[in-house]
């Protein structure tokens, strides 16, 4: 059989075989194209959603990192404040106790410095002097020191409390003419102001 005859015969067979096929079966390539387009649209939509989720994920990561940095900064600030408060407590924690001790100490100093010719009393005064010295040493070990204000010093409102202003020919205006009680410092702060009389 020749090639031509075979082709004709095959074509006849094709037509005879396809006579019985329905219209829907002939539309399969078209249906497949529609399905492909639908699937492609779904895939594109899914890819877009994935990209949106990736973008959202990046945004959330940045937000979390920013929040973490803020929290670290806040923790650092709180730690600094806490450390500063702790230093202040260590430096100035003894202030209240020192104030309570200094008032009787000043009275004891006045007793020690009062003139006395009685030998028995002088023996007690020597004992009081030792006590005053020991208390001063304890105070100094906690960085609490007397100002040692003297008559003739200039009045300083940051260190002294003027109890009285008196007329004086001997002293200049604002010069201290009398010390009623000495002042005390704790580190760099005034613990107790010196109470003084000043010339006007």
Swiss-Prot record:
Q: Could you tell me where this protein is found in the cell?
A: Cytoplasm
Q: Which GO terms describe its molecular function?
A: adenyl-nucleotide exchange factor activity; protein homodimerization activity; protein-folding chaperone binding; unfolded protein binding
Answer whether the UniProt record assigns the keyword rRNA processing to this protein.
Answer: no
Gene Ontology CC terms: cytoplasm
List GO BP terms, alphabetically. Answer: protein folding
Q: Major location, coarse class? A: cytoplasm
What domain of life is recorded for the organism? Bacteria
Matching Pfam families = GrpE
Q: Which SUPFAM superfamilies match?
A: Coiled-coil domain of nucleotide exchange factor GrpE (SSF58014), Head domain of nucleotide exchange factor GrpE (SSF51064)
The record's section on InterPro entries has:
GrpE, GrpE_coiled_coil, GrpE_head
Could you list this entry's UniProt keywords, alphabetically sorted. Chaperone, Cytoplasm, Stress response
Q: Region Disordered: what ranges? A: 1-26
Role noted for this protein: Participates actively in the response to hyperosmotic and heat shock by preventing the aggregation of stress-denatured proteins, in association with DnaK and GrpE. It is the nucleotide exchange factor for DnaK and may function as a thermosensor. Unfolded proteins bind initially to DnaJ; upon interaction with the DnaJ-bound protein, DnaK hydrolyzes its bound ATP, resulting in the formation of a stable complex. GrpE releases ADP from DnaK; ATP binding to DnaK triggers the release of the substrate protein, thus completing the reaction cycle.
Describe its partners and assembly state: Homodimer.
- Similarity comment text for this entry: Belongs to the GrpE family.
| Protein name, UniProt field | Protein GrpE
Species of origin: Mycoplasma capricolum subsp. capricolum (strain California kid / ATCC 27343 / NCTC 10154)
